[in-house]
Amino acid sequence: MSYILHLGHQPTDIAGISGLLNTTAGGFDPTLDVNAIRHVGFNSYSAPFSFSVPEPVGDLWLGFRYVPPNADANSINRAEASFLEFYSATNVLLAQIKPITTTNRYHAIAAGDTSAQGSSSYTAPNGQPQWIDVRVAVGAEITIEFYVEGVLQSTATAANANGKGKPRHVVFANTALHGISANRTWYYAHIAALDGVSTIGRRFVRRSPNAIASFNQMVGSIDALRDGDIATRVASTAAGQRMSFSLTGPTGPASVSAIAGVHLKQIAQAGTVGPDATTGFLRIGGVNHDAAPETVPDLAPKPVYSSWAVNPADASPWSDLTLPNEVGILSA
C-alpha cells in the first residue's frame, strides 16, 4: 500500500484552480514540473483551493513550494487572513496556519476542545521561494507543526476529548496574504500529502505519458492520458488489459542523494460493465512488475497510486540510472 495521499498541483484532482496554471519562471522548480498555480490580487483577495485525501493511518504531512506575494507579504492587515486549513471527514476544523495582524507572522492553531495558538518566528518574505511542510496529528490531542525550509516556525497542541476525526480535507485558504490595496502575485507548486512519512526534504518529479510503448490494449488514444483533461479517458473492456507508454517531462535535480521511490498516479473510475479495479506497472528489461490492484468507484473518478520503494527487478535501491523508461496501467 502506498503512503502517498496526494501528489501534484494540476486541476485533475484539486478543486478551485481552473485557469490558474502558469509557466512563469520562478513560480515553480523546473527540475520537478512545468507549471505552478499563480494568484494575482489585492489584500482582500480570497481564492481557496482544496483536495481530499483517504483517512491517514499515521500523521498527515503536507509539503509544497510557496512563493509569497511579491511585495507587502510581511504586512498582514485583515483579520480574515488564512493560509492553510485542515478539516475532518465531517468538515470540522482541526488545525490551521493563519497569518495574524498583530504579529505579521504565520501562526499554527490547533482547534481541539478549545483553540490553541502557537507563537511564531515566520514572516513571509516578499517573492522568496521556499518549501513549506506541515504535520497534523490527531488523537487524544490535535497537534500541528509548521516548518519552512525544514525549520520549525510554529506549533500548537490542543486536547481532543471530543474525538474529532483525522484530517480528510486540505484547504489552501489563500486569503488576505498581503497588506496593500494593489495587485500582488504569488505561487504554489509541487504539492504532496503523505501518510506518516515526513515531507521535509522530499521532492517529487512529475513526468507524463509521451508515446505508446509495448502495450496498447485499451480503448482510446494516449492523447486522453497526456492532455491533463479528466473528461478525456481510455477504457478497458476486460480485466488484464494493459496500456504502456514512455515518459516525458523533467528528469529531476542534477544531483540527488537518494531516490526514495517511484510512484505511478492515475485517476480512474469503474464503468457500468467491465473491470472495476486498476493498478500501475513498471516494465523493466522486458518484464512487467505489477502493483496490487485497487477497486475504484463508479460514482466518480478517484486517484490511484502505485508505489515501488525499490527496483522490483532486483530489490536494489533506485538510482537515476535504473529508473524505468516505460510504465503503464493495468485493468483488474
Where are these regions (language model features)?
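Disulfide-rich extracellular domains of secreted proteins
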Residues: 1-15, 176-332
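Short, aromatic/His-centered strand-loop micro-motif at the edge of beta-sheets
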Residues: 107-131
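Short strand-turn-strand beta-turns centered on an Asx-Gly dipeptide
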Residues: 147-151, 285
